[in-house]
Amino acid sequence: MSRVPDNLYYTKSHEWFLIENGVATVGITDYAQHQLTDIVYVDFPKNGEHKNKGETLLTIESVKSAEDVYSPVTGEIIEINRDLESKPELINEDPYKNWLVKIRLSNDNFDGMSGEEYKKYIGE
């Protein structure tokens, strides 16, 4: 079974996000990293880039496939988890500790599933 922390929001495309002080921390779920298997590369956007909710945020490559990660919010990328540039496999070890990007919200237009809703969505 996948780990699904209760304090986060989740999307149908398997991103998680946490909103604190107008900033969203974004990552992929445990379910997603299991589906991808061994992650070998993350193609990050640039700091300062603006992303709209639902737009491709970045791409994660694994030994199995390459998958887009979508922005769950609208705003400006203010931080990238640089540790993942040299060690993308950290996402497999703990996808919640090893977040991908932080985005300063430009509006309050976000919605997400609760942990319980996400567990039902993935059938766990």
Curated annotation (Swiss-Prot):
The modification N6-lipoyllysine is found at residue 64. GO terms for biological process: glycine decarboxylation via glycine cleavage system. Its cofactor is (R)-lipoate. Keywords: Lipoyl. The glycine cleavage system catalyzes the degradation of glycine. The H protein shuttles the methylamine group of glycine from the P protein to the T protein. NCBIfam families: gcvH, PRK01202.1. This is Probable glycine cleavage system H protein. It comes from Picrophilus torridus (strain ATCC 700027 / DSM 9790 / JCM 10055 / NBRC 100828 / KAW 2/3). The gene is gcvH.
